[in-house]
């Protein structure tokens, strides 16, 4: 074994990018099968392989960072740049949905009745469940910041409490969103209003679930004393992602729920 004379992490060959890509293919194909043939077999297979890939990839990264010491300051700097670029790519992803919404709503076509919301659509009241959802996510933004400050100050118990509150609020948001979808007086097939509403809020909801998963992993890692006040990039990345999810929701609330109604 050669001695490493640099501060960078030469990653070992890993099967997880390949299995992750295959699970994504299975999930997207399974989604189409579910929509068109009402069969969830392929979707469940895709979700299962995705969960297994996530578990094993996370396990490898935790081992490399916490137990093998591969995440030197230089490596952490690279990971921070990577996370920033990833969040920028997510901003552009959601920009497409806002573009579609404003393109349709600012100049409604005669097919929509020349008005927005389109004729026959009864939008949700922005001062009911959507406003509660907004307050839940804003509260979770406060609690994740509390968790971050507690971690930097070395206060483990407060960090765990704040992180648990954030996860609980994230799960509560998801349940509220699911109930709102169930009771909505329009569907994804109700023209451009239904499609832009459900695609934009649905992808945001998916990001909340991903962010909650990220935070749950951080919670269990903190229970096992993986984070210190000066070495906790895994948690920092999760906090950045959660704040991004917060900000996207504020734009969704103001644009689609409040102005769009």
Curated annotation (Swiss-Prot):
InterPro entries: Cyt_c/ubiquinol_Oxase_su3, Cyt_c_oxase_su3_dom, Cyt_c_oxidase-like_su3, Cyt_c_oxidase_su3-like_sf, Cyt_c_oxidase_su3_a-hlx. It is a multi-pass membrane protein. The chain crosses the membrane at residues 16-34, 41-66, 73-105, 129-152, 156-183, 191-223, 233-256. GO terms for biological process: mitochondrial electron transport, cytochrome c to oxygen; respiratory chain complex IV assembly. Keywords: Membrane, Mitochondrion, Mitochondrion inner membrane, Translocase, Transmembrane, Transmembrane helix. The keyword Transmembrane applies. Residues 35-40, 106-128, 184-190, 257-261 are mitochondrial intermembrane. Its main location: mitochondrion. It catalyses: 4 Fe(II)-[cytochrome c] + O2 + 8 H(+)(in) = 4 Fe(III)-[cytochrome c] + 2 H2O + 4 H(+)(out). PANTHER family: CYTOCHROME C OXIDASE SUBUNIT 3, CYTOCHROME C OXIDASE SUBUNIT III. Component of the cytochrome c oxidase (complex IV, CIV), a multisubunit enzyme composed of 14 subunits. The complex is composed of a catalytic core of 3 subunits MT-CO1, MT-CO2 and MT-CO3, encoded in the mitochondrial DNA, and 11 supernumerary subunits COX4I, COX5A, COX5B, COX6A, COX6B, COX6C, COX7A, COX7B, COX7C, COX8 and NDUFA4, which are encoded in the nuclear genome. This is Cytochrome c oxidase subunit 3. It comes from Gazella cuvieri.
